[in-house]
């Protein structure tokens, strides 16, 4: 693997998926930086453009303040140097404190999120990604509240070439996931990826349901590790982050999957997620194909968003 952990195929997918974002709002940001002297006008214009790119007002101010400090500390003189500094700052802001914990036997990933954000397809894409990494993956159809959710996931499981455990509509999700983890453990599978309900009536219901699922995982396999990934739709941007805040608190999420990045010209919500939600982005969706979910690397993302070889 080359480019920050990516091979050429992944780098090309990232480049293509972020084209709309790179050539619009973020291209304008590059023009501001590389076409200006470093002064208050440049900082003001940069802040405005970061807000337009859907970074959010508070995060835009934070980034510009950090850039001012970095420019002063390092004695930077040119717009190109300021652009380099901004790249570094954004990558630092998005860097997770730790890698995902997939050390368990099996490693269990719960996937949560409201309906319509691409949760089911993200599960299949995760299964495909980890299968290509040499893992044996089993899916759990834990969204038993929505008609056809299990059938939809079964179709995607077939495409990904992985087995799935499911039950009838209205079955207990914790029981379905318990059975899946038990089966995966008995059959020597490395990983279970579990769907969960996309809509529960209130926060306490959600907390109770996910707490019950967590207990069922540990009961089924005491050696299991557990990650909970929240799926957000990048097209809805800052609205997605606002809606997710309460969801995160209730669900005890450990990371984010950001879908549909290829469908937005803004993309700034990726930069804002970690600071606003306190959670790292783990994967990004850059297309509709089953292999269009990429592991998120801050440096690789920033290099595509704010390319060093920039032509006005």
Report each predicted region and the residues it spans.
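Primarily NTPase-proximal linker/entry elements flanking Walker-type ATP/GTP-binding cores
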Residues: 15, 20-144, 149-194
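Conserved catalytic-core segment of NTP-binding enzymes
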Residues: 152, 172-187, 201-310
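Short hydrophobic/aromatic patches at helix-to-coil boundaries
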Residues: 195, 311-312
């Amino acid at each position: 693997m080359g480019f920050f952990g990516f091979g050429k195929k992944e780098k090309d997918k990232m480049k293509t998926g972020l084209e709309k974002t790179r050539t619009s709002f973020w291209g304008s940001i590059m023009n501001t930086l590389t076409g200006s002297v470093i002064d208050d006008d440049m900082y003001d214009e940069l802040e405005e453009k970061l807000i337009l790119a859907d970074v959010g007002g508070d995060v835009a101010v934070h980034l510009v303040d950090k850039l001012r400090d970095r420019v002063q500390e390092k004695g930077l003189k040119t717009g190109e140097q300021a652009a380099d500094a901004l790249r570094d700052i954004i990558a630092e802001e998005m860097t997770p404190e730790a890698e995902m914990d997939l050390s368990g036997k099996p490693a269990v990933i719960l996937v949560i999120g409201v309906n319509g954000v691409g949760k089911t397809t993200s599960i299949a894409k995760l299964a495909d990604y980890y299968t290509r990494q040499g893992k044996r993956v089993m899916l759990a159809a834990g969204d038993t509240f929505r008609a056809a959710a299990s059938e939809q996931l079964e179709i995607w499981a077939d495409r990904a070439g992985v087995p799935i455990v499911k039950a009838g509509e209205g079955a207990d999700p914790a029981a379905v996931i318990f059975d899946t983890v038990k089966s995966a453990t008995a059959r020597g599978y490395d990983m279970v990826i579990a769907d969960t309900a996309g809509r529960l009536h209130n926060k306490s219901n959600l907390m109770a349901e996910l707490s019950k699922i967590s207990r069922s995982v540990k009961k089924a396999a005491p050696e299991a590790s557990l990650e909970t990934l929240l799926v957000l739709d990048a097209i809805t941007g800052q609205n997605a982050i606002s809606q997710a805040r309460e969801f995160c608190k209730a669900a005890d999420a450990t990371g984010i999957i950001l879908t549909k990045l290829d469908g937005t010209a803004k993309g700034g919500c990726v930069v804002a997620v970690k600071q606003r939600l306190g959670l790292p982005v783990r994967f990004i969706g850059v297309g509709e194909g089953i292999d269009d979910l990429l592991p998120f690397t801050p440096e690789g993302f920033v290099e595509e968003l704010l390319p060093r070889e920039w032509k006005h």
